[in-house]
Amino acid sequence: TYIDTLFEKEIPKTQEAFARFHTYYQIIEIMISTVFEDKFKKFVEQLNNSVDSLFDQRDELGNMIQEKQRVKWLFSEYVSISQQEKNILDECCRKLLQENGKKINTEMGDNLYSVRCLLVHSMYMLNEYSHKLLDEVNKAFLDVIMDMLLTFKIT
């Protein structure tokens, strides 16, 4: 699978922190696409069994297409990660977000998504200290990814 290829070929040679983060985040992208498929199938089943119109359920459908929401569902419903590893990754993300004047959220998944957005939209503005913080994020992120790969299941 593509994930096997990432671990066998890409991750060992990816040394730059930015590239490493995006390689790890690709695993999240793969998982949230599966989350979307699962949620959408359940949504269609619910529509078939419901007297409510699609118009009445448009908000739920809108939530499904938001990446941030799928990341939340992934961490809350589809994987089991030790609280300690969640806390470590969350703290690393918080430090990086704070250093760059970004909003800090209450949930680890939200903070991880915010780091992703920071890197995609503002990487060119990161200072040297932020790059060191990103290395810390990556170390914690890899531990979380390993747990995710071992525990991912469709609900």
Roles of regions detected by a PLM:
Residues 1-155:
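Amphipathic, oligomerization/interface secondary-structure segments
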